[in-house]
Amino acid sequence: MVARSRMGGPWSRAQRVARAFQDAGHEVALAWGDDGNCVNPVAPTLEIPVPSPLGLPDAIARHTFPLASRLGLMGRKPVHSFEEVLWLTGALDERYTRAAVELLRTHMCATRPDVVYSEFNLAAVVAARAEGIPCVGSGSQPTTTAYASSPRKSAGIRRLLREMGMPAPASSLTILEGMWRRFIPSCPTLEPQAGERAVYCGFLDEPPALTPRPRDCVLVYFGAGSVPAGVAVRAGRELAEMLSCDVYVAGVSEAVQAVGDREVTCAPRFDFAELLPRARVFVHHGGQNSVMDALTYEVPQIIVPGRVFERRFNAEAVENARCGLSVRASKPALIAHAACALIDEPALTSGIRGVRAELRSLGGGARIVREVEELVG
């Protein structure tokens, strides 16, 4: 999945899957786009076009959407389904999909891959089906039509499919659900109804061994656009004061603020693998990668999902599994009080080790490779 908005999850998952196939001795090509998310590819690449949000002219979209993200304006619009996400990013635009499918088909026709793996890329599934190539890919419970869909957003895709002589389901999500296998980077405890042809694979990479060390900081990361940068920084200050520890706020401009004898360090990005083993709490937006990162290092989670369907699903799943708490309103004081509650009440995080063990047992990227090898022979 390529998109103009800042979303590192799809690319990082695609990279991990690619490495798993490489480790098993397979040749891999990565389709990528100039969207600011696709960097440092681990395999040879094929450049594909990047959709323009809402089908707007590219020159406008390049400037307006990053600005809206920084101001937190994106978080004010409810997003009810993954179909709406595809529409907002421009991935359902008929002209874009036609161009992407043609380019991908040309590449597939020339190279004849044994299988296509789609990281929520609709054009890849359509192109593979048109070329008669097996297609598998990533999936999740909240991206199924049974969970939520918005068929009115997919009229252009239906026209294109009819023109290509293919079935044109009401919802574009049905196309993604029709892949030969759907690999769920989660577990039944968190996503009990993942849909047809679902294979749970848990952590894509083997999690590191955990060694005892002081938990002496809090990490805050709200992703792209769901919470204004100023609110994230104020939440960091509240957390530093109430928990009496240093706080790191990712996804904002560089700064260091003193709160008593503690510091709130802000930066566009940090190495989470260095900070999470030290973290008492991880406060985040509910993205899939953030949820898995917290569980990897057995860190209690505070999720502030905003008005996005998938993040709300993840927040509820984490809370029900006793791995953290959700806070619906992005108010710094509420976030800090929830963090205190997590630390003071062990029962609220009593499920973390069990869920981590379940995720670890499901096979990860190696499981994906084995399933695909059996599928295509």
Indicate where each model-derived feature is located.
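Conserved nucleotide-sugar phosphate-binding/catalytic loop shared by glycosyltransferases and other
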Residues: D23-A24, V28-L88
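A nucleotide-sugar donor-handling region in carbohydrate enzymes
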Residues: Y147-V227, A250-E254
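Conserved nucleotide-sugar donor-binding subdomain of glycosyltransferases
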Residues: T64-V115, G156-S171
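A donor-sugar binding/catalytic signature common to diverse glycosyltransferases
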Residues: V116-E119, R269-A315
